[in-house]
Amino acid sequence: MGDAPETRLGRFYKEHIDLILKKDIEAILDQYTEDAVLISSFEKVPRIFRGREELREHFKGILGIKGLKVDIAFWGEVDDKLLMIVEAIELQTDEGTAKMRFADSWVLRDGKIAVHFAGMVQYPDGNIA
């Protein structure tokens, strides 16, 4: 496992994580198209967010993130337009350290994320999605 590669998408992903750490929601939103769609399974039920205002509500959840560590288990990209990542995530919560696994897939248009599948693969309680 490791870090994102030194490719255009690798650098874009690193910037995305850095913006999350900085809690810079507006800059994160600037990485998405105006009509972007994000499908999330973080809450064990599908949540669909369309457009910047709904994405803004989704990303408000990052304000509570502390001590985020990302370890990439799988990285696949095609032509600066498609990206699939499996990440081992560790972060601090009020209850202690939470460990989980995500599978993120991005479809990019004009250098911005148009479609984002944000999938929880393993929940903090250890259950597999």
Question: What are these language model-derived features?
Answer:
Residues 6, 25-81:
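A solvent-exposed, acidic/Ser-Thr-rich amphipathic alpha-helical stretch
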Residues 99-129:
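Short beta-strand edge/turn micro-motifs at domain boundaries
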Residues 35, 81-82, 105, 112:
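Structural motif
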Residues 64, 90-99:
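Short, cysteine-centered beta-strand-loop-beta hairpins and adjacent loop/turn segments enriched
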Residues 11, 67-69, 97-100:
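Short solvent-exposed loop/turn micro-motifs enriched in small/polar/acidic residues
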Residues 70-76, 89, 101-107:
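Hydrophobic/aromatic beta-strand elements that line small-molecule binding cavities or substrate pockets
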Residues 79-89:
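A short hydrophobic beta-strand element
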Residues 1-30, 34, 128-129:
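Short, low-complexity N-terminal intrinsically disordered segments enriched in polar/charged residues
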